[in-house]
Swiss-Prot record:
Catalytic class of the enzyme: ligase
InterPro entries per UniProt: aa-tRNA-synth_II, aa-tRNA-synth_II/BPL/LPL, O-Pseryl-tRNA(Cys)_ligase, Phenylalanyl-tRNA_Synthase, SepRS_C
GO molecular function, one term: ATP binding
Catalytic activity, as annotated: tRNA(Cys) + O-phospho-L-serine + ATP = O-phospho-L-seryl-tRNA(Cys) + AMP + diphosphate
Signal sequence range: none
Residue ranges of coiled coil: none
Family: Belongs to the class-II aminoacyl-tRNA synthetase family. O-phosphoseryl-tRNA(Cys) synthetase subfamily.
Organism: Methanococcus maripaludis (strain C5 / ATCC BAA-1333)
Function: Catalyzes the attachment of O-phosphoserine (Sep) to tRNA(Cys).
Single biological process term from Gene Ontology: translation
Protein name from the UniProt record: O-phosphoserine--tRNA(Cys) ligase
Length: 537
């Protein structure tokens, strides 16, 4: 914490001096904890749920009430709604099936089998019979069966399961039997039930909407069809309702999603639950995508179907696929990849890859960590010294109860060179999925690489790590290791950089996997000609 009174006193005496000197009180984060290796943490919504919420709000703004329609629909309702067309429609429905409950008796043979497992049945026979009978009658749930058998025989649940497997094989041989109940394949099957019940409960006209899941037995799933999808559907019931209401609702709803201009084209399908010549496809123009898109269907329910549900006023229904709208809004090409991204390839952005490039070794001790900055500054300042030359830094550290005198000598003995090589100030960038070392200046860079490197510097994501930075951390990290191991001297020599590890850098496996799979590159090659000798006394 700051010593506020001292700072104020210093500022009162000499504000400029206090302003400059107090900057050291703001400690910089360590390299692996600095930007871009730190990222803001936030959650992420799903595009389908985003679209559902946007549709909900759009319907509510238009004065609709939200309802949840039944998901499980008896096939009789499909016949009532579709008439003779029902058989063809039911082909796309999923039927619900369940396992039958076998009539399992407790014969002498089964009692003998149980007793062979070392369990006395005589005292518990009646209790066991009651449990089996209760299961058959449906008064006992299947997931409680093992527990109840175990309790009745006063045995462990593991032994109860063994009895079920070995003595009562009837349970293993069960085959599901289909019922007459179906999973809703479209929202209409639910609207007839809902509107029918509300006819004597709500004053006419009324406007309802529901956004929920439907199930359709597609022959196969592809880039535009799934076996389960969300329908955003509405129904308006009242005298005078006709297809003009459908047109107005379509425009009012879809204009809230950026669509302009609408075409209403008669649907060739002519479903029997709609009044003839009312089933209509809605095409809308999206100025961003610059194309006309089919986005919804509406129609007026047939008086024949309505009458079977006790409904004696017109009902207009409009529906659209949520996933379809989400694909348009998010510019997705494949509904499967949009809905289930976890099962498809995930592409990391350059920003994300940059956050995964880190120093491999970093000293833990603050004093040694702070030495790194001094070492970096000295190297940058003296990098162009003409050889033979050397740069020496001496420091004394307290390590436990001992003093460590450290002498770091950076040198170049060969004549006609600089203290450090030309790539020493290269910085690591991530550009178009590639991890590359980009020089401070493009003087002397071959023309075949120049354009790519210039674009990388202008458009890529800088990691903020130069070769000299990472290498100096390598030196100070080895110095710390030498303190711990009581080593008195060591050398660091890096002539040519060929890989990240040569400059004390590492990259997360996730990023590395993407780079390899996308045939991208990690290219950090360059001459640094670093020669270091460190002595500790």
């Amino acid at each position: 914490m700051f010593k506020r009174e001292e700072i104020i006193e210093m500022a009162n005496k000499d504000f400029e001096k206090a302003w400059i000197e107090t900057k050291d009180l703001i400690k910089a984060k360590k390299v692996n904890e600095s930007y871009p290796r730190i990222k803001p943490a936030f959650g992420k919504t799903h595009p389908v749920n985003d679209t559902i919420e946007n549709l909900r709000q759009a319907y509510l703004r238009m004065g609709f009430e939200e309802y949840i329609n039944p998901v499980i629909v008896d096939e009789r309702d499909i016949y009532k709604q579709f008439g003779p067309e029902a058989m063809a429609v039911l082909d796309r429905c999923f039927y619900l099936a369940g396992l039958p409950r076998p009539d399992v008796g407790l014969s002498d043979e089964k009692i003998s089998q149980i007793e062979k497992l070392g369990i006395k049945v005589s005292e518990h026979k009646e209790s066991l019979q009651k449990i089996l009978h209760g299961y058959k009658k449906g008064t006992l749930d299947g997931d409680d069966l093992v527990l109840e058998i175990s309790n009745a025989l006063e045995i462990s649940s593991e032994m109860g399961l063994k009895i079920l497997e070995e003595v009562f094989p009837e349970f293993k041989d069960l085959t599901a039997v289909s019922s007459k109940l179906t999973l809703r394949s479209h929202m209409t099957s639910g609207w007839f039930l809902t509107v029918s019940d509300l006819m004597n409960k709500k004053p006419l006209p009324f406007k309802l909407f529901s956004i929920d899941r439907c199930f359709r037995r597609e022959q196969k799933e592809d880039k535009s069809h799934l076996m389960t999808y969300h329908s955003a559907s509405c129904a308006i019931a009242g005298e005078g309702v006709d297809i003009n209401d459908g047109k107005a609702i379509a425009e009012g709803l879809l204009s809230q999603f950026g669509f302009t201009n609408f075409k209403f084209i008669p649907d060739e399908k002519k479903s029997k639950y709609y009044t003839p010549e009312t089933q209509t496809e809605v095409y809308a123009y999206h100025p961003k995508l610059k194309e006309w898109l089919e986005v919804a269907t509406f129609g007026v329910y047939s008086p024949v179907a309505l009458s079977k549900y006790g409904i004696d006023v017109p009902v207009m229904n409009l529906g659209l696929g949520v996933e379809r709208l989400a694909m348009i809004s998010g510019n997705f090409a494949d509904v499967r990849e949009m809905v289930y991204p976890q099962f498809y390839e995930h592409k990391l952005s350059d920003r994300a890859v940059a956050s995964m490039v880190k120093l491999d070794k970093v000293p833990v001790m603050d004093e040694i960590y702070d030495l790194t900055k001094e070492l970096i500054d000295s190297c940058v300042k003296n990098k162009d010294l003409k050889s033979p030359c050397e740069l020496t830094i001496e420091k004394t550290f307290s390590f436990g109860k001992t003093k460590k005198n450290v002498k770091i000598n950076i040198f170049e003995k060969e004549e006609g060179k600089n203290l450090l090589g030309p790539s020493i100030l290269n910085e690591i960038y991530v550009y178009d999925g590639n991890v590359i070392g980009i020089p401070e200046s493009f003087d002397g860079v071959k023309e075949e690489f120049k354009d790519f490197l210039e674009k990388g510097k202008a458009e890529g994501v800088p990691t903020g790590i130069r070769y000299i930075d990472a290498l100096c951390f390598k030196i100070t990290s080895k110095l710390e290791e030498a303190f711990v191991s009581n080593t008195t001297e060591f050398k660091v020599k890096v002539p040519i950089v060929r890989s990240l590890s040569d400059i004390n850098l590492k990259i997360d496996d996730i990023a590395l996997k993407q780079i390899m799979s996308k045939t991208k590159v990690i290219d950090v090659r360059g001459p640094v000609f670093l020669n270091v000798e460190v002595k500790i006394e």
